[in-house]
Amino acid sequence: MTVTLGMPAAPPRPVGTRRLSRQIHVGNVPVGGDAPVSIQSMCTTLTSDVNATLQQIAQLTAAGCQIVRVAVPSQDDADALPTIARKSPIPIIADIHFQPKYVFAAIDAGCAAVRVNPGNIKQFDDKVGEIARAAKAAGTPIRIGVNAGSLDKRLLEKYGKATPEALVESALWEASLFEEHDFRDIKISVKHNDPVIMIQAYRLLAQACDYPLHLGVTEAGPAFQGTVKSAVAFGALLSEGIGDTIRVSLSAPPIEEIKVASAILESLGLRERKLEIVSCPSCGRAQVDVYTLANEVSAGLEGMEVPLRVAVMGCVVNGPGEAREADLGVASGNGKGQIFVRGKVIKTVPEAQIVETLIEEAMRLAEQMEADGAASGSPSVSVA
């Protein structure tokens, strides 16, 4: 039987036209221009613990991280950079605060880029020329990372607090200092913990320069709160074409940041869709435990590398219609489930066999898609 699948192999076009920015390269990852929006995270290990750091980087890479940042608060951390930069499977960005000497150590170590915070590096403006020369000689991009929590005191006095205008002025001022030394291998971030202020700042920045922009809501909070803040801010900006690389900051294991970032990009059509569950909130009409069914189907399909859409429906109101719109689906009721493949009922099974049947059919469809040369992605599961 030939099955026509509902989900397109290519993602839908993003909502807005992409902002045209200059392109830089962070290691082998292009950032800006027409390059796809890339995903970043940051290690939570002590950088001086080389083995633990490399192990976490490997886990992040497997989850889909493309660029990773490591903290360099001490000489021991700086001493670990050459080994980490050499052995990491993805580009390393050294995160530098307070001590400009670590900027030069990171460049010498072969890091793919260096993040500097102009708000807290001692005599940063006086060091820009030396940093620019070293970075240019090594081909190392610089990220000017402005943060609301460490804004230059001069700007706080001028604006009274970390306003969007203050964040942007800080970033553009530091960029202009690098430009005076003919260095433009730059990307910029202007982070705030309030997504509304953050959105306003990036909109202003996008109009004022053509540097690639790294998006982030700083100190976003625990997993749930941070996910909501990041989704709101990134969704608004990326739908307007603003943003070239993103990091979801969560008070959670960094691998969770990658999952959220990937889901945000997929939801906007900026990355091929993978595992996606669309489920109803359940109600008194549901004739099946939707929560358990959705979780079991999701767990059973986790890791499948094809863009498959599966619908798991809990009642007869929207169930049949939603299931027909999916590549694979079930409409549940009266202790049984009708299994749909691309809108056609192929069998009816007892409720106890729904999960097993869906997983079996998903595997079969995945094999067919791979045989037909479909682009890889993960399954997309819809539950209601």
From Swiss-Prot:
The keyword Iron applies. InterPro entries: Dihydropteroate_synth-like_sf, IspG_bac, IspG_bac-typ, NO2/SO3_Rdtase_4Fe4S_sf. Binds 1 [4Fe-4S] cluster. Disulfide bonds: none annotated. It is an enzyme of class 1 (oxidoreductase). One of its GO terms (molecular function) is 4 iron, 4 sulfur cluster binding. Pfam families: GcpE (PF04551). It catalyses: (2E)-4-hydroxy-3-methylbut-2-enyl diphosphate + oxidized [flavodoxin] + H2O + 2 H(+) = 2-C-methyl-D-erythritol 2,4-cyclic diphosphate + reduced [flavodoxin]. HAMAP family: IspG. PANTHER family: 4-HYDROXY-3-METHYLBUT-2-EN-1-YL DIPHOSPHATE SYNTHASE (PTHR30454), 4-HYDROXY-3-METHYLBUT-2-EN-1-YL DIPHOSPHATE SYNTHASE (FERREDOXIN), CHLOROPLASTIC (PTHR30454:SF0). NCBIfam families: ispG_gcpE, PRK00366.1. This is 4-hydroxy-3-methylbut-2-en-1-yl diphosphate synthase (flavodoxin). The lineage of its organism: Bacteria, Bacillati, Actinomycetota, Actinomycetes, Frankiales. The gene is ispG.
